Structure formats: structure tokens, C-alpha cells
């Protein structure tokens, strides 16, 4: 069989383009320009109002309410700039052996701002890109509101706080492990930001939980626009308390609804199994709240049709449906019309009623005269009632007159607060992933395309995914690097339907086709805020029939039905836009950002009063003493059991940045002096700490080794450590790694502390952790020139340092989740121009199927390779490679291409 010919037609790949702007903020590379903001952040005060009544009372609340909520507005730094379309176009170009010209243009306009304005932070507007931010949501939301001017700009907040108040709390510790067991010690979180949240939030159980949640609701409220909504997803353990808390924050008058929805699987309980979770819905200003009703399909056998118990046969006979007919309407004769009876009278509140009033008059049906009962009146005028009678919409029921409402008058029914259709299989990538349909409905009810959506609890990025699908802008926040690693991969590889834009030539044409009306003559601009071209459903109402000018006496039934159809109202189905199946859409440009250095609130002086009152953190001295004791016992381990740095002596050191000093013996009996620096208890080790500790060690008493211990290291940590090494080793005569790791003048060892240390001695005993201090590996990369002057990068694994010999050895690529290349690194920001996912999953499977006619298997396989596709020598002379492991740890390496 001859091979199938490839189509020459290129499938358009699109993204949603937002005309909105965002304020320019610093990148990690340009952080030195905002040192003042980092060192002395402005403190924002959120006033307390203890006079609110009724309100919850919990342990420590009086002390919390005695002071305003104080939160520092710290800078947020851009770590990566990602344009998924550029990655896909690169794959397509590789398959066709074309030059990926589109990629350069896509990144060229990422900022839309000149350099001198780029470093004048917070003063200029640049192109919108969606945002994924690592850090404490309280700090991030405060910074967004106060430093970046987003106060009153967010249309919807979706918050999914932890459900319970127990130890396990279902934190996912790796991108590879989703079978997390609640209250199981080995599944405890392995990330300092989340440990901080665990200790602060759960130390006093529900008391701390409520303090934690109230602060974040207060800051979220400040971000909401007056028409905005806040949704909180919660389980049955705390729904009653959280509703009271939201009454206190938003005001009881701002309560909209409590939505109950079915979970995919029931939660085991001692008595009844729990199959339902809840969504609490509050508006910022209930009188101005944006609301777009959603509808579900009505059917006699299914939902929405239960009240339709009568049938009108083609011969005009009307009767009640039999049980068999209700179960299967297909057995009815063709032309039968199912209906229900409705009221044709209304209350006359504040208006004249009874005999003599405008709506009190006799109506004759089938020779019998009827009057409205009691103080009620007819729902329409005499002419209107005559129209209803001519249309066969009035029927006598004893002494009452009723309105005939056909099943097909409105083939849908409005969504209420009981969502029993949300259970079902989902492709989970995160242990506590929120049901996509739940977020989708919340978003569609309260936002329009182009509106801004915020999720302070990112998880696997479901809110961002849904917002992207429906053309909303999004910001998502999480303390978990694992969560953001999963979310980033999910969004980079996502494929979405291409919906017709109302403000586009194709959209105008589609709308004319659907409505049967001539398209208006106007210039389109592709503005997403004008929405999509939506499906509509006819809605025949009593009012539309009563006021129909075309219904006349003597008309046939078909003529009357046509007149009713012409003047029927329509309802917009906001969840059913028309789709162009010939095009595909991918995620638009977004940035990965973090507080610096992945900052969390740590000291009592810096933490909000609520968290201080809920749980007093142990002193820094106590933490350092515990680390010293464990360092003495455990030493520093690499991935090989026998290779451990054992301290002969280790004691406190009275330095500014150095905490301990001691000695160890290398193989061969050579004694060496070592200095130890301990990173923050609840944060990430950044380049500033490494630099200052190294300077102090060099100026000191001749240390042979510096060990920097931290729970997490930012991506630039290795680059900083390498500045204190010997002369850079050349990978070739043309390529020099900036700061290629050398253990010369002052070897710096980055040791990742087991996060169980942050949980305290009690948990440490419970988990039985063995390797408490592990050497932080550096990726083993090979950059080489290939034919046509192009360059490739190969990742061989992670370099492991043997503390007993001082030698470096490479391990496999198994621990690497993904790696990115900026093939033209300018030193100002990291653009993800190449992306490779070496984990077990294949995230691009859906896009692969959509583009199977254009891109062959070999080109797609490049996305999962440990060797990059060839690329041109960079204009700027540098490339940067970022490697991310399954725990979300990142390392960045920069190469000078000479």
C-alpha cells in the first residue's frame, strides 16, 4: 500500500489575543533594579471591623482584631516567558525542515515596551500575558492590588482551600506520584512554602484555618471589581463555618447561593458516604453583580421535563400522558405536542385588583366564562388573552383557567444550584484536582471573554485551563512548585476549540448564517471582549404570544405557530459558542513568576497579626540548633549511600551569614575546614544569600568548603555558586559555560535539606527520614556545534558531587521532568523557545492527533528527547538552559557562544 500523501494545507494555529495591558514588573535577571522594594517593602493595612454581627469567634481572634491586617507589598519577579504557539510552530518547522520564522516574531512583541521603559518598573504598561505565580497567596494578592494596580480589576476569584484540618492534607510531593494517602507520613509535603502553610494553618486546627482563610478572603475582596464574584469550594466539614466567615468578609447581603455538586467518588465515613461538595458564591456588590444564566437541555425522559404530563394529539385531542408515553415519547403519533399547565393569573401587588380593575374581565373558553380568582388579575390584557385563546394556549380545568406551555416552547431549563451531573471520570494530573465542569460553570455565569480571573490555589491549573479555553485572562497562584510544574506542562501542551469571534470577519459571516439576517457593514478588530458567536435557543413565553401582532382570527394552526416562532424571544447559550473545526487553538503567552526568593512570611515582625496570634513560630535559634544537631548526626549525603560528608567537628560560628564551622576528613586522611550557611526556614535560597555567605567564607580563616543548606534553591543558585569557583572550564573552544562548576578556590556545596526538618523533631521521628541533607545536583549538559553552523544541547543527567573525594559524577535523566532552552538569551528575561518533556507522560498527545497530517512522529518525538533539535547561533551570543526535576526544583545554566 503506497504511503499516504501529506496534505500541503497548513492547519492554522491560533491563540486568544487580549488588548488589555499589564504593568511592567522585574524579571529575575533585572532584580537588582528593585533592591529598595525588596529590602523595604511598603506595608499595606487592611482595616478590621469588629462591629460586624453576627460573626464567628475563634481562638486568637480578639488579638487579631485589635490590629489591622498588615501585609508587605513585595515585588513579584518573572522567571520565564512562555509562548506555547512558538514551541508548536518550532515542531512543525522541524517536520517540514523550514526555518521557524514565526517564533522570533512571537517573542519580539511579548513585552511591547522599549528597554528604558522596561527597567522603569511599575510605571509603564506592556502587552498582556497571563500569569502563574509561586508564593504565598496573601503576599501575591497584596502585591497585585497595591504595587501593580489590580485593585478592583478582577472579575472572578475561585478559591479552593484545603478541606480538612488534619496532618496529611493530600499534598502531592512529585509530578510522578498521585496516589497520595491522607495522614500518611511519607506523603507529607516536601516543599518549604507548603510546610509553612501546614504549620501556620493547622497548628491550632480550625482556629488557625479560619484566621488563614479570612486574611485571604479580605485581600481577594479588594481585587474584585464591583460586578465581580468570589467562589469558595469547600467540603462538608467546614462549609457552615466558611459561610459565616464569608458573611463577615463580604456582608451577608452579598450572599448569592450555595451550590452543591456531585464528586467523582464518595468519601468513606462512619455512617453515610459523602458524595457532595459545595461552592459558596458571594458577590462584591450584589446589586451590580454580572450574571449570565446557563441552561441545560430539557427532555421528557430526563431532567426539566417532569412537570410535562399532558399531550395534545394531531387531531386536537388533549389528555394526560400514560406511564409508557412519559418514559418513551417516541411511541406517540407524529405531530403530538407535550405540554404542562401553568398559571394565567398574577398577583396585583400595589396595583388595583378585583372587579373594575384593568386586569379583571371575563374570558370565554369552550363556551364557559372565567374570571380571575380572589384579588388576582389576568397576566395580560383582553387583546392578549384573545391571542392566547386563538393560539390554543388556554384550557379549562374545572373552575380554573390555565395556560398551555409546550415542551418545545423552551427546549432548555435554567441551571439551578443542584449540580448532580458533575460526577464522572476525569484525567487527573494532580491529587486534589478540581472538577473542570464546576469551575467552567462558575466562570461562564459571572464573566465575559476578556475578563480577568484569579485563582489563589492553582493546583494542577484547572482554573487557568478553563479560563484559557473560554477566552478569559487569568492569574493563578500556588505555594507548591510541584503544582506549578504540572500546571505549566498542562497549559503548554493544551489544545482548545477555536470559537468564532463575534468581532471577526468569519464571526460576522457565521452570525449572519445562523440568524438569517444580513451581516452589518462594519470593520472588525478581533476584540475578544465582544465575545463569541453563540448558539441561541427560542423561548416562547406567554408574553410573546399575548403581544404578537401577527395572530389573527381565522388563521390555521401552522400559520399561528409560524407567527409565534417569528416573535419568540431567544436565550443565549454562553456555554455553546460555534466552533471552527478547521482551526485549532493553543494557550496564549503566559509568564511563570515568583516572590523573591520564592518568599513566604517568616518572622514575627513580617507576618500578619492573624497568623502571629494563631500560632507563634519557634525562634530562629531553636531552628538552627535543631539543624546543627542533625548535621552532626547525618552529615551531607549525595544519591549514593556510601558517599557522605561526615563532620569530625561542627559548632556554632559567630558570623553574619555563616552559622557553623567545623572539620571533615577526605579519603586519604586529609583534614579540611568547612563553613555552613543555613537558608531560611520557610523560604528559598537565592543568589544574594549564597554570594554573601561565600564572601564571608573567603574573608574568613581559610575555609576549604562552604556548604549552603536550604529547603529549596532558586534557578540561579548554581550560577551564583560558580562565581567563586576556579577559572571556567571550556566545554569546547567555541562554547563556554558561564560559571561551569569547579571545586577550586572555594567549592560551594548546595545541600537540599529534607523538608521533614522544617516540620520539627516530632514529625522527623515519625517519618524516619534517613537522608536529611542531600547535595543539590547540577544538570550535566553538552553543548555542541553541528552541521550548517547550528547548535544542539544534550542533557545526560544530573551531576552528583561525592563529598568524600571531591569528585563529580553524572547520574541518569530519570529525575528530570522537563527542560527548556532560550536559544537567544539576552540576560534580561528567559524565553522558553524550546521545551522538552522527559517524564513518562506525553502531554502533546491531543495536539499530535490534531496535526497528524502535517507533523510526523519523528518531529513530535523531539519534544520528549534528551537532545534538542538544532538551532541557529544566537544573535546575543548566549543561550540559557533551565532544567526542572519532578519536585519542581529548577537549575539555570547560561552558555556564551563565542
Tell what function each PLM region has.
Residues 297-409:
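N-terminal auxiliary segments of SAM/dcSAM-dependent transferases
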Residues 1-317, 365, 390-393, 397-898:
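S-adenosyl-L-methionine-dependent nucleic acid methyltransferase catalytic domains
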Amino acid at each position: 500500500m503506497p504511503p499516504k500523501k501529506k496534505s500541503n494545507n497548513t492547519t492554522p494555529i491560533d491563540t486568544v489575543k487580549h488588548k488589555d495591558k499589564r504593568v511592567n514588573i522585574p524579571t529575575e535577571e533585572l532584580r537588582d533594579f528593585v533592591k529598595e522594594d525588596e529590602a523595604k517593602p511598603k506595608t499595606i493595612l487592611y482595616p478590621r471591623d469588629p462591629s460586624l454581627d453576627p460573626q464567628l469567634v475563634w481562638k486568637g481572634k480578639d488579638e487579631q482584631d485589635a490590629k489591622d491586617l498588615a501585609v508587605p507589598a513585595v515585588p513579584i519577579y518573572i522567571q520565564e516567558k512562555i509562548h506555547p504557539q512558538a514551541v508548536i510552530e518550532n515542531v512543525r518547522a522541524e517536520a517540514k525542515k523550514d526555518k521557524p520564522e514565526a517564533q522570533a516574531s512571537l517573542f519580539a512583541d511579548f513585552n511591547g515596551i522599549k528597554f528604558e521603559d522596561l527597567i522603569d518598573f511599575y510605571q509603564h504598561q506592556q502587552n498582556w500575558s497571563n500569569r502563574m505565580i509561586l508564593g504565598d497567596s496573601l503576599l501575591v494578592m497584596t502585591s497585585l492590588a497595591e504595587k501593580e494596580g489590580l485593585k478592583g480589576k478582577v472579575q472572578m476569584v475561585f478559591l479552593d482551600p484545603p478541606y480538612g484540618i488534619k496532618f496529611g492534607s493530600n499534598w502531592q510531593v512529585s509530578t510522578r506520584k498521585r496516589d497520595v494517602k491522607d495522614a500518611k507520613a511519607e506523603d507529607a509535603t516536601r516543599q518549604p512554602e507548603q510546610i509553612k502553610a501546614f504549620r501556620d494553618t493547622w497548628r491550632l486546627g480550625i482556629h488557625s484555618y479560619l484566621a488563614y482563610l479570612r486574611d485571604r478572603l479580605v485581600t481577594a475582596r479588594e481585587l474584585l471589581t464591583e460586578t465581580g464574584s468570589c467562589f469558595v469550594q469547600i467540603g462538608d466539614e467546614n462549609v457552615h463555618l466558611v459561610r459565616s466567615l464569608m458573611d463577615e468578609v463580604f456582608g451577608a447581603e452579598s450572599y448569592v447561593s450555595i451550590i452543591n455538586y456531585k464528586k467523582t467518588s464518595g468519601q468513606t465515613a462512619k455512617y453515610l458516604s459523602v458524595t457532595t461538595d459545595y461552592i459558596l458564591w458571594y458577590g462584591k456588590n450584589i446589586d451590580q453583580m454580572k450574571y449570565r444564566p446557563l441552561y441545560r437541555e430539557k427532555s421528557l425522559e430526563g431532567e426539566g421535563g417532569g412537570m410535562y404530563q399532558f399531550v395534545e394529539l394531531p387531531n386536537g385531542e388533549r389528555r394526560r400522558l400514560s406511564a409508557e408515553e412519559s418514559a418513551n415519547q417516541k411511541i406517540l403519533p407524529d405531530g403530538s405536542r407535550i405540554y404542562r399547565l401553568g398559571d394565567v393569573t398574577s398577583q396585583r401587588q400595589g396595583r388595583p385588583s378585583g372587579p373594575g380593575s384593568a386586569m379583571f374581565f371575563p374570558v370565554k373558553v369552550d363556551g364557559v366564562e372565567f374570571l380571575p380568582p380572589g384579588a388576582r388579575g389576568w397576566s395580560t390584557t383582553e387583546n392578549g388573552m384573545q391571542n392566547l385563546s386563538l393560539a390554543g394556549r388556554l384550557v379549562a380545568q374545572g373552575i380554573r383557567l390555565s395556560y398551555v406551555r409546550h415542551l418545545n416552547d423552551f427546549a432548555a431549563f435554567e441551571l439551578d444550584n443542584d449540580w448532580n451531573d458533575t460526577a464522572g471520570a476525569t484525567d487527573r494530573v494532580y491529587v486534589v484536582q478540581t472538577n473542570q465542569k464546576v469551575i467552567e460553570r462558575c466562570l461562564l455565569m459571572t464573566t465575559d471573554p476578556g475578563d480577568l480571573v484569579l485563582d489563589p490555589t492553582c493546583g494542577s491549573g484547572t482554573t487557568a485551563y478553563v479560563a484559557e479555553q473560554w477566552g478569559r485572562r487569568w492569574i493563578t497562584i500556588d505555594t507548591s512548585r510541584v503544582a506549578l510544574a504540572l500546571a505549566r506542562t498542562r497549559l503548554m501542551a493544551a489544545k482548545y476549540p477555536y470559537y468564532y469571534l463575534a468581532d471577526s470577519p468569519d464571526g460576522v459571516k457565521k452570525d449572519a448564517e445562523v440568524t438569517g439576517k444580513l451581516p452589518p457593514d462594519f470593520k472588525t478588530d478581533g476584540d475578544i471582549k465582544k465575545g463569541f458567536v453563540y448558539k441561541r435557543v427560542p423561548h416562547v413565553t406567554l408574553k410573546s404570544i399575548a403581544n404578537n401582532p401577527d395572530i389573527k382570527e381565522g388563521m390555521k394552526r401552522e400559520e399561528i405557530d409560524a407567527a409565534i416562532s417569528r416573535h419568540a424571544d431567544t436565550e443565549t447559550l454562553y456555554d455553546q459558542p460555534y466552533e471552527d473545526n478547521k482551526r485549532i487553538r493553543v494557550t496564549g503567552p503566559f509568564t511563570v513568576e515568583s516572590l523573591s526568593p520564592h518568599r513566604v512570611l517568616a518572622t514575627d515582625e513580617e507576618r500578619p497579626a492573624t497568623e502571629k496570634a494563631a500560632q507563634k513560630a519557634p525562634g530562629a535559634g531553636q531552628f538552627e540548633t535543631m539543624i546543627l544537631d542533625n548535621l552532626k548526626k547525618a552529615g551531607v549525603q549525595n544519591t549514593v549511600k556510601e558517599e557522605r560528608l561526615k563532620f569530625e567537628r561542627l559548632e556554632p560560628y559567630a558570623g553574619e551569614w555563616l552559622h557553623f564551622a567545623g572539620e571533615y576528613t577526605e579519603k586519604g586522611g586529609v583534614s579540611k575546614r568547612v563553613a555552613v550557611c543555613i537558608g531560611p526556614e520557610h523560604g528559598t535560597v537565592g543568589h544574594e544569600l549564597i554570594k554573601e555567605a561565600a564572601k564571608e567564607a573567603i574573608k574568613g580563616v581559610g575555609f576549604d568548603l562552604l556548604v549552603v543548606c536550604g529547603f529549596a534553591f532558586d534557578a540561579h543558585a548554581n550560577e551564583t555558586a560558580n562565581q567563586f569557583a576556579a577559572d571556567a572550564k571550556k566545554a569546547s573552544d567555541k562554547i563556554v559555560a558561564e560559571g561551569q562548576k569547579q571545586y577550586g578556590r572555594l567549592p560551594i556545596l548546595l545541600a537540599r535539606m529534607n523538608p521533614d526538618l522544617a516540620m520539627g523533631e516530632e514529625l522527623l521521628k515519625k517519618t524516619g527520614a534517613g537522608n536529611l541533607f542531600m547535595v543539590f545536583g547540577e544538570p550535566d549538559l553538552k553543548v555542541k556545534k553541528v552541521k550548517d553552523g547550528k547548535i544542539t544541547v544534550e542533557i545526560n543527567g544530573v551531576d552528583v558531587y561525592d563529598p568524600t573525594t571531591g569528585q563529580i559524577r553524572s547520574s541518569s535523566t530519570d529525575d528530570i521532568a522537563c527542560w527548556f532552552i532560550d536559544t537567544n538569551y539576552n540576560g534580561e528575561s528567559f524565553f522558553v523557545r524550546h521545551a522538552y518533556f522527559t517524564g513518562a507522560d506525553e502531554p502533546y498527545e491531543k495536539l499530535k492527533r490534531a496535526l497528524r497530517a502535517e507533523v510526523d512522529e519523528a518531529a513530535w518525538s523531539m519534544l520528549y528527547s534528551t537532545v534538542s533539535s538544532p538551532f541557529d547561533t544566537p544573535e546575543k551570543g548566549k543561550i540559557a538552559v533551565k532544567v526542572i526535576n519532578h519536585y519542581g526544583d529548577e537549575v539555570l545554566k547560561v552558555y556564551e557562544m563565542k
